[in-house]
Amino acid sequence: MYQPLLLLPLLLTSAFANPHDPHIHHSLEKRASFPIPSSKGSVTFSSPKTISGTFDGGMKTYGRGVKCTGQDEGGDEDAVFILKDGATLKNAIIGADQIEGVHCEGSCTIENVWWTDVCEDALSLKGSGSGTHKIIGGGARNADDKVIQHNSGGKVIIQDFTVQNFGKLYRACGNCKKQFKRTVKISGVKASSGKALVGINSNYGDTASIKGCATSVKEICVEYEGTNNNSKEPKKKSSGPSSYCKYSEPLSKC
């Protein structure tokens, strides 16, 4: 008659022990890891560094020595790097001690660049041009809102990018005073723990094509009714695959 009572602690011990199984722990740890390269040193700029050609950061961590101000809008003076039209930034880590990350004033290439903690935005694509912006490799995490903010026109190519714990990976500006038709092509993305992967303004003819994997991302592609009134917020129209949001649902899990 005492056997069930004796077995109960053993069953409870077994049940609570399962989450600590080394194979399960390894699986969870692997899924949650952020594959940022090891830093080769740190550099703090007193003002933004302007790049007009190619800058190889040598996998050092770059910052401004300031505290993030959250979603308070900053300006060019708060950026770590400002890229002139046609410039390239590669092999760099953007630290947490900054506000505006990287600004591109025209077409630019961002290759193997990592953001340890995004502040207002990680990358802002500015200017009035209609060229091509390339983001190849690299990654970003801990973005309360946007990772890539696309204010200019043209095309954005995002290839083999890792993003974790974010609001949106890409957002076409919803209320810029000057609006454009914008295109984003995403391939090989690895996304986890996000609100939306992409936000576009379909009323301006924006399109997004998306391939990759996503885990715990609430929405993949959201269409908005954009406006050129900077004092108004764009209205959400729809979410999911369409002639503007081009992808197959569901994306595979990472």
Curated annotation (Swiss-Prot):
Segments of this protein annotated with the region Disordered: 227-254
Enzyme class, first EC level, given as a word: lyase
Keywords recorded for this protein, A-Z: Calcium, Carbohydrate metabolism, Cell wall biogenesis/degradation, Glycoprotein, Lyase, Polysaccharide degradation, Secreted, Signal
EC numbers, comma separated: 4.2.2.2
GO cellular component annotations of the record: extracellular region
Catalytic activity: Eliminative cleavage of (1->4)-alpha-D-galacturonan to give oligosaccharides with 4-deoxy-alpha-D-galact-4-enuronosyl groups at their non-reducing ends
GO molecular function: pectate lyase activity
Lineage of the organism: Eukaryota, Fungi, Dikarya, Ascomycota, Pezizomycotina
Keyword Calcium: yes
Signal peptide: 1-17
SUPFAM superfamilies on file: Pectin lyase-like
Activity profile over pH: Optimum pH is 9.2.
Free-text comment on the cofactor: Binds 1 Ca(2+) ion per subunit.
Protein name: Pectate lyase E
Protein's organism: Emericella nidulans (strain FGSC A4 / ATCC 38163 / CBS 112.46 / NRRL 194 / M139)
Temperature dependence: Optimum temperature is 37 degrees Celsius.
Domain of life: Eukaryota
Subcellular location field: Secreted
Pfam families linked to this entry: Pectate_lyase (PF03211)
Glycosylation sites per record: 229
Function: Pectinolytic enzyme consist of four classes of enzymes: pectin lyase, polygalacturonase, pectin methylesterase and rhamnogalacturonase. Among pectinolytic enzymes, pectin lyase is the most important in depolymerization of pectin, since it cleaves internal glycosidic bonds of highly methylated pectins. Favors pectate, the anion, over pectin, the methyl ester.
Cofactor(s) this protein cannot do without: Ca(2+)
Family, per entry: Belongs to the polysaccharide lyase 3 family.
GO BP annotation list: cell wall organization; pectin catabolic process
Composition bias, Low complexity: 239-254
Main location: secreted
